[in-house]
Amino acid sequence: MLAFCRSSLKSKKYFIILLALAAIAGLGTHAAWSSNGLPRIDNKTLARLAQQHPVVVLFRHAERCDRSTNQCLSDKTGITVKGTQDARELGNAFSADIPDFDLYSSNTVRTIQSATWFSAGKKLTVDKRLLQCGNEIYSAIKDLQSKAPDKNIVIFTHNHCMTYIAKNKRDAIFKPDYLDGLVMHVEKGKVYLDGEFVNH
């Protein structure tokens, strides 16, 4: 019972810290909360959270070639040239505050290309489990985190996975656009959703 209380207090303490950081971030990012009810977490706030414990950031892939009139990078199942530019820009901004992270993607051309352009040369590990968008994705995240408990993780996945996580974890309606992100962490074998990543 005592252990449970301590765990509960720790979780509450962490959530209070997160709310405070989100409020501070909100002063410079128009609002501390997104319209979907998720806390907004920008680069600087994310860097502060990463000092508390490793973070897991999930991104939707960049602009799909087969659903755009923009020029394709290569394969029709991949992303557009604009998508590569957007992914590189996001990666540069992200890496400025979180330079050390392990990089993963699902086994589709669009997520692999997005992760590759985001990372600018960082080693990419492709994991087909990251295409599974039910409770299975939590098992995959916990497994990846257990391999390097002290490392931050970036995952390129799909909109339906992120929509599922937001609804399942916080009962939030989240319809991510290209390269939108969610911030999570793993604590004592459980996966927690901290909020929506906003690139500012």
From Swiss-Prot:
Amino-acid biosynthesis: is it a keyword of this entry?
no
User: What cellular component terms from Gene Ontology apply here?
Assistant: periplasmic space
Q: Please give the biological process terms from Gene Ontology that the record holds.
A: lipopolysaccharide metabolic process
Q: What's a Gene Ontology MF term here?
A: phosphatase activity
Write the record's keywords in alphabetical order, separated by commas.
Answer: Hydrolase, Periplasm, Signal
CDD domains with a match to the protein in the record: HP (cd07040)
Q: Which residues form a coiled coil?
A: none
- Asked if Signal is a keyword of the record, the answer is yes
User: What pathway is it annotated to?
Assistant: Bacterial outer membrane biogenesis; lipopolysaccharide metabolism
* First-tier enzyme category under EC: hydrolase
The record's subcellular locations are: Periplasm
- Matching InterPro entries: His_Pase_superF_clade-1, His_PPase_superfam, LipoPS_heptP_Pase
Q: Where is the signal peptide?
A: 1-25
What Enzyme Commission number(s) apply to this enzyme? 3.1.3.-
Q: Which function does this protein serve? A: Catalyzes the dephosphorylation of heptose(II) of the outer membrane lipopolysaccharide core.
The family annotation for this protein states: Belongs to the phosphoglycerate mutase family. Ais subfamily.
Write the protein's name.
Answer: Lipopolysaccharide core heptose(II)-phosphate phosphatase
* Species of origin: Shigella flexneri serotype 5b (strain 8401)
